[in-house]
Amino acid sequence: LSSSVVFVEKWPVLGRHGKAAEWLQVWSDLGRAARTIDAYGRGLSEFLIVCEREGVDPLTAGRADVAVFVRELTERPHRRGANVASIDSGAGLSNATIQQRLVPVRLFFGFLVEEGLRESNPVGRGRFVPGRHHGGTRRGLVPRFTKLPWIPDEQQWRDVLAVAADEPIRNRVMLALAYDAALRRAELCSLRTDDVDPGRRMLRVRAEVTKNRRERTVPYSAPTGVLLTGYLARRATISRARGPLFLSESRRNHGEPLTLWTWSKVVRRIALAAGVERFSTHTTRHLCLTDLARMGWELHAIATFAGHRNTDTTLQYIHLSDRDLADKLAKGMDHIHAWRVAMLTGAEATGTAK
């Protein structure tokens, strides 16, 4: 089946609005990640359903029509709380989620402008440009609230590590690498055996699994290297084949690549057991980058290490000074990372990973 047929099967409303399916096909053909396409398709289909209910033609919808969609998002029951009273009330869909839902709507209208089917974009922030998510200077419909990433305090981190110390070695090395190399969830779970260079203690993060589609190479510390060596020995008892680094040890999926969702469940279980409910798969990344900023790393060095395309994203982790990445790791990162991962590396492997 062609991807356009799959889109229509998954989101029938796109098939009722041909330009919508065509727009999503463009982004798919441009090589956007499957999860990005899924988010775009879901977000635009929600908007189109609201248009149909309100009797509005999406090709001629105006700012007021998009505002109706925003209102519905703000009134939608949140799975973890009550209905929202206002965009910044703290209940209902978060400001970030609403912004995400508006991205495909804005891009779709930008596409219609480029196609000559309308003159302006009611969502604002510029026109459809392949490879870019935004442009222009017009203010968006919904104010964007920028919050600093949450990171655990030292006691919370110790509580997490105390629980993690009793985890199987696979889970401990994943936590250690997630912190040590500031890896995103998808980057961590997608690591392959040939992405690891134990001799140089370096990881290759392949372009196809990164958020900005740019490959990078990042170092990891000696304590994590010791833990990784132990895991590789464990992995060899499951499979000697090259391929995905982290494998399932459950009866149902024994030897299969570990999924993003399984890793999320592992981290969630650890967080709840430690009494640190806000701890997530992305927390280790935030903590690592914050530590680098505290140690005086220069802005562009952190951006390179993190795989940030825009240094504006990196600014939240503070201002820095210049030096070579690997050299900085040896001189500065080790003494902070070593104690952070000591509890992970100090316990013998126990139990079976799921």
Give each language-model segment a name.
Residues 3-5, 331-354:
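C-terminal secondary-structure termini that scaffold catalytic or DNA-interacting sites
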Residues 21-35, 45-138:
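N-terminal core-binding DNA-recognition domain of tyrosine recombinases/integrases
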Residues 114-119, 178-201, 300:
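Short, charged phosphate-coordinating catalytic segments
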Residues 131, 185-186, 190-230:
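Conserved tyrosine-mediated DNA breakage-rejoining catalytic core shared by Y-recombinases
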Residues 152-185:
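Basic, Lys/Arg- and aromatic-enriched nucleic-acid-binding interface segment
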Residues 209, 306-331:
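Catalytic-site neighborhood detector that most strongly recognizes the C-terminal catalytic loop/helix
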Residues 221-276:
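Active-site/catalytic core of tyrosine-dependent DNA strand-transfer enzymes
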Residues 264-304, 308:
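Short, basic (Lys/Arg/His-rich) helix/loop patches that form interaction surfaces
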